[in-house]
Structure formats: structure tokens, C-alpha cells
From Swiss-Prot:
Any Pfam family the entry gives: TRAM_2
UniProt binding sites for [4Fe-4S] cluster 2: 180, 184, 187
A GO MF label: metal ion binding
Ranges where the Radical SAM core domain occurs: 166-398
Binding, [4Fe-4S] cluster 1: 10, 46, 78
Gene: rimO
Catalytic activity: L-aspartate(89)-[ribosomal protein uS12]-hydrogen + (sulfur carrier)-SH + AH2 + 2 S-adenosyl-L-methionine = 3-methylsulfanyl-L-aspartate(89)-[ribosomal protein uS12]-hydrogen + (sulfur carrier)-H + 5'-deoxyadenosine + L-methionine + A + S-adenosyl-L-homocysteine + 2 H(+)
Protein name: Ribosomal protein uS12 methylthiotransferase RimO
Sequence ranges assigned to domain TRAM in this UniProt record: 401-469
InterPro entries: Elp3/MiaA/NifB-like_rSAM, Methylthiotransferase, Methylthiotransferase_CS, Methylthiotransferase_N, Methylthiotransferase_N_sf, MoaA_NifB_PqqE_Fe-S-bd_CS, NA-bd_OB-fold, Ribosomal_uS12_MeSTrfase_RimO
Uppermost EC category: transferase
Cellular component terms (Gene Ontology): cytosol
Organism: Herpetosiphon aurantiacus (strain ATCC 23779 / DSM 785 / 114-95)
Enzyme Commission number(s) from the entry: 2.8.4.4
Amino acid sequence: MKFHIITLGCPKNTVDSEGMHGILTREGHTAVDSSDGADVVIVNTCSFINAAREETVGVLQELANNKAPGQKLIAAGCMAESHGDVLRSRVPKLDATLSTKEWMRIGSVVAGGVAPSKTTGFGIPLMGGAPSAMPSTGLNLSLTPAATGDSLGAYGDWRTTAITRNKRGPSAYLKISDGCNLRCAFCTIPSFKGDMRSKAVGSILGEARELVEAGVQEIILVAQHLTDYGRDLGMKQNGLGVLLEELAAVVPADRWIRLMYAYPQSVTPDLVETMARLPQLCHYVDMPLQHAHPDTLRRMRRPPDTDKTKAIVNSLRQAMPDLSLRTTFIVGYPGETRDEFKALLEFLEEMQFDRVGMFRYSLEPGTVAGELPDQVAERVKERRWNEAMAVQQVISRARTARFVGQTMKVLVEGTGTDDDGRAIVVGRSYRDAPEVDGLVFGYGAADVGQFAKIAINKTTDYDLWGEIV
């Protein structure tokens, strides 16, 4: 069969989509670049907040409305797990939903390994009629054989299994764990991802070797709680540091390893030292902090000790003076007073983060935060978001301007010409994670997927400009 996978949401979903791609290609199916002409279309869904769920439904509805005769449509992943009944109700032309815990069975679903009673010809229960006995899946998984293995090791757990990598482009995400042991008041993820499970070091190294052999220049480590890696494997407090040492023996010194989603309270002195010492490690950390006022943080069920957070940030900057630090904050959280918001603005000014993702609080049914009193009005959220972004824009502009006169190592991701016909490349420096950060533009020629040196002579709020040297 020909299949096409559409991935919505975070990089962790990208990794799971690669896993499904690997399973299907190993079983003889063929990937195609468009839903047109595909026998099976798989959408790896997102359920992070309501806006993400609405986007998921919209994508599925459009695909359903344009289904070719005989074409099958599968919703996989987070929203299939958390709101499978909603998907089946709003997208009745869905042929199956496959939860986060079952994506390894995608081969059996596509092959139609289910008994024929009350099924379509595709081998899955019809979506109409009475509600399914398994509300998060439209497939009777008891009738579908469990995945028994993959190219890198025995299948043990849906979150910890190594996957065959489908290399697309010079960068690749590598998920080292899934699930989360934290219970932040605003977050639904543990309710459908479960507690954290770390992938075995050997499995991670196997994936990394495959990516290196495929020519990937940048490996981006992702997890729900990156810095807690290995705790469930008995690695205590420095599991991530131990893993990085092992990865450094696999990834050449001239390539990049990037860390995303590092929880601040789990950053140890040993980890800081390891990051500063290993040449592969980008001096970059994405460290979601969410707020800066102790009272707000307590309501969020986050560590309220902002002094400790400052000490951790300072230790990272002392070890790596060129560190690029990204974080995220939520404004308009229930009960956020003007004084609490002012504390956040002061924190931005004091800490001088390179990049900030600012989010307006989104009420999620079923969360502790959703039941809190003093929900903040939408107009107040919008005003505070604009105010905070204005403060951070000035900071980001100044942080970026420091690089004028420097020569940056840039991973080239595209080439073209400007309005005058001059050759130009676009890529990212160590300061820039894919999609969420800035870009580097350089006049001259270079190969896509390789590193180039660009002498910086101009900056904007978030981007760098220069000449290839």
C-alpha cells in the first residue's frame, strides 16, 4: 500500500511519525509525499491545548471530505488517546484511531489484522453507531497482534522502543523518554502519556548511529522532562549527563547535539560541566520556566524558588558564557494579579533571556488549573501578552546585536537569490532551534545540509545577516 503521514504538534510527535514510517516501510508499504494517491493517510494528532485540537479536527475533516474511493484515514497519537470519542463524532469518515500507546501496531492496522465481525473491509470497527468499548481507540487491539520487534531491539514499551529513523533534512529529533512524573496544574499530558519512561541508553545510541550514518548534522534530544532522563533506570540525578558522554562517542565532534525541554530543578553541576566540555553540545538550552512569581508558581504546582532558578541559570552562563537560553512563560494564569505579572516583567529584565515563547493561558477541562477561581479575562491576557512580548523584543534585539562582527558556524537549510539576483543561503546557528528561533542569512554559495561560516554584519530582532567566508 501507499501511505502518507501528516504530523501535527511537537517534535516528539515527529519522532513517533518516523517510527510509524519505519514500521510500514519495513513491511513493504511505500511512502508518498501527498495524501493524493495514498491508499492510507495517517494523521499524528496533537492534544496540547484546545487550539491544537481544533487544528487537528480541521485537518482530519478536510482529508475526510476529500477521501478518494477506497482510501483509509487513520488518526493516531495524542488526541486519538485523549479525545478519541470526539474525533469519531466530529470526523465520522475516520476509519480508525490509534492511541499514543499503540502506534507500534500501525502495521497491523494498515494490513487489516482484525476479525471481520462489525468491521469495514479494512479490518477495523465501523466508526458509526454505538460508542466503542475502548473510547480512545476505534480498533479492537485485542484482536491485533502486538508489535514483536524492530530493527534496533526488542519491543518492550511504546515509549522506550528504538525506531528506524526516516532521515529528512540535516537535523533530526531523538526522543529519549516519554511521559512525565510531574503534575503541573495546567497540563493534561500525563493523563494520556502516563509517567515518564526512559529509553535505554543502547537504544538511543543505536538511533544516533543510524542518524550519523545518514548524514544528519544536528541531533536534537527531546523529552517531556529531558533532565530527568534515566531516573527510572536507576541512574539517579545525572542520567542525562551520562547519556551525553555516551552520545559523544557516537556523534562526531564537528556535528551538533541540542537539548530541548530541560526542567530547571534537575540541572545538576555535573550536567553543566558535561555540557560545557563536550564539543558536540550546542551551548543552547530550552528551559521552560512558566512564571517568575512564587505564588503563581505554587498555583501551577511548579517549584516556587525563583532564587534557585536564577542560580541554575547563572551556573550555566558561567560555564558557557556564549550560552543561548530559551524559555517559555504563561501570562493570564488563574489568579495572576498585576503584581505577579509585574514580577514576571522584572524577571525578564533581570535574566535577559535570548528567546522567549510567551503563551496566553488556555483553560483545559479536567486540569486543576481549570477549576481554580479568579480566571483572568481574555482581554487582560491579551494585554499582558503584548506587554511582555514588547519587553522581551527589546532584550532579544540587544542579545542578537552582540554577534555583529563575529563569524558563526551555520547549518545551511536552504539556498536562493535575493531581489538583485545575488546568491543567498539560509540556516541556523547554535543559537537557533528549528522552527521556534531565528535564522541566519548569508550571501554566497554553500551546500544544503552542510555547515558554512558566515561573517555577521547585520542583525534584526531575531535573525542574523552576513557573508559566507
